[in-house]
Amino acid sequence: MNNYPTALFLMGPTASGKTDLAIKLALQCDCEIISVDSALIYKGMDIGTAKPSNHELQQVPHALVDIIDPLESYSAGDFREDALSLMQEITDRGHTPLLVGGTMLYYKALVDGLSPLPSANPKVRAQIEKEALENGWQALHDKLEQIDPVSAARIHVNDPQRLARALEVFRISGKSLTELTKVKSDPIPYNIKQFAIAPLEKSVLHARIEQRFELMLESGFEQEVRKLYQRGDLHLDLPSMRCVGYRQMWEYLQGTMDYEEMRFRGIVATRQLAKRQMTWLRGWQNVTWLETGHADNFERIKAML
């Protein structure tokens, strides 16, 4: 057995009850929270991301919340670097890092490390986009299928950002995205205890998602997105504006759908996010499952510390 310090992962789909449980652990078990959520990183995006309240954040600080403007980008690599640094600081204080959230790509980057992918090259990307303009994205998808059939099967023709990135990686490095992503980093120096929380029944999760979206609408979500919309420098191609709920509300403000359709699509998009998160989690190794709202969840995690 190694002498590595313990770190806790509290994973789960959106609206599963992670935050309440995490705050209780932080208050009673000398844990410090690191957010693992690609939406909570953005300033000014509070209601639609179900960000912990100001009172909760004052009571229990969450690292990696409100760290960038919605115009800025933040990668899984940025997360890994920040999280490892924070985990070291927390263990140096004699506390336990508690990583909480549902962005499974961030967890994967932290645990498995990052592949040695080349940095973005504006000239190469511009050439790819020029080809797309001339020949269409389908033609570029066909090219990807020839050089990297595994990535082509995974990346949809209507996902130009990922499609362009896969082609860019090949043109810069001469190696496919699939080939490069097989290279892994060394394991991180922690004994990781992994928990996932979710309702037993999918219908319960769906009901929680709908209730939470309704509460967001009642709490001023439209006004929050309108403020972002009126800035004039944000658009739907940004990762921040592709967050569930924000895209639908943005399109409503543009006049491309009515209020009821926005509400319906926002709930559906959130359910689809939860489904993707559950798919990740079902394939995750060494996870202890907790049922949302169960009385002994706190004690089960505490017993592992």
UniProtKB/Swiss-Prot annotation:
Recorded catalytic activity of this chain's protein: adenosine(37) in tRNA + dimethylallyl diphosphate = N(6)-dimethylallyladenosine(37) in tRNA + diphosphate
The protein's organism comes out as Psychromonas ingrahamii (strain DSM 17664 / CCUG 51855 / 37)
Family per record: Belongs to the IPP transferase family.
What do we know about how this protein assembles, alone or with others?
Answer: Monomer.
Instruction: Please give the superkingdom of this protein's source.
Output: Bacteria
| Class of the enzyme per the UniProt entry, highest EC level | transferase
Positions contributing to ATP binding: 12-19
- Looking at the UniProt record, the site noted as Interaction with substrate tRNA sits at 103, 125
Region entry Interaction with substrate tRNA, spans: 37-40, 161-165, 242-247
Instruction: Return any one Pfam family short name.
Output: IPPT
Which NCBIfam families does the record associate with it? miaA
Q: What does this protein do?
A: Catalyzes the transfer of a dimethylallyl group onto the adenine at position 37 in tRNAs that read codons beginning with uridine, leading to the formation of N6-(dimethylallyl)adenosine (i(6)A).
Q: Where does substrate bind?
A: 14-19
Transferase among the record's keywords?
yes
Task: Name the keywords, alphabetized.
Answer: ATP-binding, Magnesium, Nucleotide-binding, Transferase, tRNA processing
Q: Does the keyword Glycoprotein apply?
A: no
Q: Which cofactors does it use?
A: Mg(2+)
What's the Enzyme Commission number for this chain?
Answer: 2.5.1.75
The protein's name in its UniProt record: tRNA dimethylallyltransferase
Q: List, in alphabetical order, the GO biological process terms annotated in this UniProt record.
A: tRNA modification
Q: Which InterPro entries match?
A: Dimethylallyltransferase, IPT, P-loop_NTPase
Q: Name one molecular function that GO assigns to this entry.
A: ATP binding
